[in-house]
């Protein structure tokens, strides 16, 4: 498995369009494993294609267990789309592997529904999820649409990041 470098904000790759994945093969499985390894090495819970210079619509997520361990909740989302945002808008502390050393409070919907394909190309849905998983889904899928969590901050806070 290959651990790759995480692309750091404000790299222009984050603003480029990403392409849907249409071939579901061993190369895609290897890409997802490489993404997990890179995410774990950098102590993350989610990683999107553009963060490793892959302008493809792929996201990997692994929400830690209560004891902080990872590996039991590995999820790969291919061509994910948020189809519904529900509930209150909640504020939570977020960070990003592409913005190392910085965290801030960000507002997101408390629940979401996401449609995606798995590694076999089968269509799947996470329906009305909440908590950290919902926040992580919204955060990572934002990457696929050229948005980072820092885009939700005030201009003054963003300017301090450069």
Which residues fall in each region the model found?
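Positively charged
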Residues: 1-162
């Amino acid at each position: 498995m290959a651990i790759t470098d995480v692309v750091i904000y404000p790299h222009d790759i984050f603003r480029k369009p990403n392409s849907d994945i249409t071939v579901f093969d061993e190369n895609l499985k290897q890409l997802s494993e490489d993404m997990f390894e890179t995410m774990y090495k950098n102590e993350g819970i989610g990683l999107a294609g553009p963060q490793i210079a892959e302008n493809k619509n792929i996201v990997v997520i692994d929400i830690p267990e209560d004891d902080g361990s990872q590996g039991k909740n590995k999820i790969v989302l291919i061509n994910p789309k948020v189809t519904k945002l529900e509930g209150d808008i909640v504020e939570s502390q977020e960070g990003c592997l592409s913005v190392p050393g910085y965290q801030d409070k960000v507002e997101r919907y408390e629940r979401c529904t996401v449609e995606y394909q798995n590694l076999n190309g089968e269509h799947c849905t996470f329906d009305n999820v909440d908590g950290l998983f919902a926040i992580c889904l919204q955060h990572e899928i934002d990457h696929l649409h050229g948005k980072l969590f820092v885009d939700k901050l005030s201009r003054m806070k963003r300017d301090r990041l450069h």
